């Protein structure tokens, strides 16, 4: 048995052993509630999906990390570039897909960048400290969330205002940013965030400011290369007013921007090298969310305007400008806690400037129904009629049955789903600066999955999912964008387990197997394992250990245009925190890549070695 199988087997055996040796004095756990797979608060046992939830507590145990680094620890997900230089482009490889198949929501509003090649939202713009919780649904979710929700929806909820009149939270972190071969421990990372929030009668407010500056590492591999700094600023303001028990209105405005030095492919050889190139991205968002509640139901509107300006300064430089208007209006109604219905209309208007301004719009009516029976059968089903100004109309739908049964103090459930999604070519692929093709056809995805889950009220849960995903008309790039002539099929297995019933100890682990039936997907590991152990030593001191195994991948060496095998690697991270002054002050430390593992994430690019950061969080 090789080391990979020892690791996987060891983690599963440890968790199962701990399950059978649970502390008899363990406190009964509260029922877990999930939202994103139906937009209703449903007990997890009544959901037909394995929704990933990241709580505020977990975020606090990962302070100093980026959002991409945190998400990268979850099953079925590989965020390529999250281990490299801070400004590295990110690849969202979820269930064998890529960036264009992942939809991001922030406080219920769809966000993307129409000028980007894959129309995705750039997670480098997000300040993790401003987030309250995250839910991730894997699989096709276009029925509820529309175009691009083919492999996952990342649903981000930002922090809400305190009930106090004035509350202040401040975090500051300093640390190193060095490669495996450069272990001088110079301070090159500075992270700061401040939040001022509160409630005055029916009025509430929250203002956030964040800054992240990281230097000390070159994008191109080699310790003698010029360092490539990354700098980001985030500001946001959200205001709300509760007019009555039934009606609430909230509005927000935010400005996010980052600047990073990058390395590129200079003339005349056009080989990857240490250069003085730069990349700048600036995002402005403003939105409003009125909500009216009535008996057993509510009507809500999430509307936002986004403006994005990007510039690449290099031998192949470009300037991109994009705007979008998104409006999602829906009615939710609960029929006697058995039928949960949503009827909605989603509108999107997207513009981007290339040689001239290009645009498209979508108008999607949608319907979703959840049935929760008393005898264990649950059904989540719905349909969306996507109307695209350039590609006409397309029906997408989802059928997601599940069956639960009581087992001791918990439950067991079996579930499955059949879901379709529709991804229209984006503006950059149709009209952009590099290889545009106005004759592209839309991509269509079908996802079939089935799984089992068991959980009890003592804090133990385990689940497993098998999925198969078929892509038709996959958009690929050769010398220009084109549709692949062959369908692509991705199969996979995801296993998750967690245990919180032993006093002061929490354990979680996940394993992912992903395989493209024919062909190659670059930088996608076939096997991946994550393990976390956290222990609360007393009311003040907490420590945790994270382990990640990433299996072999294939990447292209763009100096030779030959594919190469990348070795598997393992990384261990440690986190410590200590509370002071009645929990108003917290000191914490992160040690990442504890064993200073030497590995390659992307051919030709740097990866981070052992790094240390120290921080404090003050709450007033």
Feature names for model-found ranges:
Residues 111-138:
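Short acidic/polar hinge/loop motifs at secondary-structure boundaries
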Residues 171, 375, 466-470, 484-557, ...:
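Gram-negative outer-membrane beta-barrel transporters
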Residues 268-289, 293, 415-500, 521-527, ...:
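Outer-membrane beta-barrel signature, preferentially recognizing the C-terminal barrel domain
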Residues 244, 336-342, 346-469, 502, ...:
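Structural signature of Gram-negative outer-membrane beta-barrels, strongest in the C-terminal barrel
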Residues 6-8, 21, 85, 197-200, ...:
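Conserved C-terminal beta-signal and adjacent last beta-strands/turns
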Residues 171-187, 191-277, 552:
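Periplasmic-side early beta-strands and strand-to-turn transitions of outer-membrane beta-barrels
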Residues 68, 72-110:
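Extracytoplasmic beta-strand/coil segments of soluble accessory domains associated
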Residues 32-62, 91:
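N-terminal periplasmic "start-of-domain" segments of outer-membrane beta-barrel proteins
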């Amino acid at each position: 048995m090789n080391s990979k199988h020892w690791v996987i087997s060891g983690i599963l055996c440890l968790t199962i052993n701990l399950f059978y040796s649970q502390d008899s004095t363990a406190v009964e756990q509260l029922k877990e509630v999930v939202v994103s797979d139906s937009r209703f608060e449903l007990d997890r046992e009544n959901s037909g999906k394995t929704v990933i939830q990241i709580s505020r507590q977990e975020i606090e145990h990962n302070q100093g990390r980026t959002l991409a680094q945190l998400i990268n620890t979850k099953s079925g997900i590989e965020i390529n570039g999250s281990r490299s230089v801070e400004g590295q482009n990110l690849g969202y490889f979820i269930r064998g897909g890529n960036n264009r198949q992942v939809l991001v929501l922030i406080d219920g509003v769809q966000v993307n960048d129409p000028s980007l090649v894959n129309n995705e939202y750039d997670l480098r713009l997000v300040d993790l400290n401003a987030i309250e919780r995250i839910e991730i649904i894997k699989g096709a979710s276009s029925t509820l969330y529309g175009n691009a929700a083919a492999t996952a929806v990342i649903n981000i909820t930002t922090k809400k205002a305190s009930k106090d009149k004035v509350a202040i939270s401040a975090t500051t972190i300093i640390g190193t940013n060095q490669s495996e071969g450069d272990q001088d421990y110079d301070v090159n990372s500075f992270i700061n965030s401040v939040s001022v929030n509160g409630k005055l009668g029916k009025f509430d407010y929250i203002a956030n400011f964040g800054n992240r500056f990281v230097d000390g590492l070159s994008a191109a591999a080699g310790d003698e290369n010029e360092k490539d700094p990354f700098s980001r600023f985030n500001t946001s303001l959200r205001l709300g007013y509760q007019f009555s028990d039934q009606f609430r209105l909230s509005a927000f405005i935010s400005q996010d921007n980052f600047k990073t030095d990058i390395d590129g492919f200079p003339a005349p050889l056009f080989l990857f090298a240490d250069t003085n190139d730069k990349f700048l991205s600036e995002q402005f968002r403003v939105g409003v969310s009125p909500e009216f509640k009535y008996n057993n139901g509510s009507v809500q509107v999430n509307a936002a305007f986004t403006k994005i300006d990007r510039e690449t300064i290099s031998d192949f430089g470009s300037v991109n400008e994009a705007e979008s208007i998104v409006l999602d209006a829906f009615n939710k109604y609960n029929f006697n806690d058995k039928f949960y219905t949503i009827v909605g209309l989603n509108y999107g208007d997207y513009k981007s400037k290339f040689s001239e301004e290009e645009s498209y719009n979508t108008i999607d009516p949608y319907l979703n129904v959840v049935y929760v029976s008393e005898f264990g059968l649950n059904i989540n089903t719905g349909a969306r009629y996507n109307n695209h100004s350039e590609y006409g109309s397309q029906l997408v739908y989802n059928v997601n049955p599940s069956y639960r049964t009581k087992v001791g103090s918990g439950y067991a459930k079996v579930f499955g789903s059949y879901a379709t999604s529709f991804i229209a070519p984006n503006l950059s692929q149709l009209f952009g600066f590099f290889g545009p093709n106005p004759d592209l056809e839309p991509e269509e995805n079908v996802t079939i999955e089935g799984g089992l889950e068991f959980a009890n009220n003592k804090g133990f849960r385990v689940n497993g999912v098998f999925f198969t995903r078929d892509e038709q008309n996959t958009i690929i790039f050769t010398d220009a964008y084109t549709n692949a002539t062959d369908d692509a099929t991705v199969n996979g297995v995801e296993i998750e387990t967690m245990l919180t019933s032993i006093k002061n100890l929490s354990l979680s682990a996940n394993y992912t197997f992903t395989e493209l039936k024919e062909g190659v997907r670059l930088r996608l590991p076939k096997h991946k394992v994550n393990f976390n152990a956290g222990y609360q030593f007393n009311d003040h001191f907490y420590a945790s250990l994270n382990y990640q195994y990433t299996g072999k991948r294939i990447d292209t060496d763009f100096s030779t245009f030959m594919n190469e095998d990348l070795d598997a690697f393992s990384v261990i991270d440690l986190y410590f925190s200590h509370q002071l002054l009645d929990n108003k002050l917290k000191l914490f430390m992160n040690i990442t890549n504890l064993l200073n593992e030497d590995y390659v994430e992307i051919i030709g690019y740097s990866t981070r070695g052992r790094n240390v950061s120290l921080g404090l969080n003050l709450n007033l």
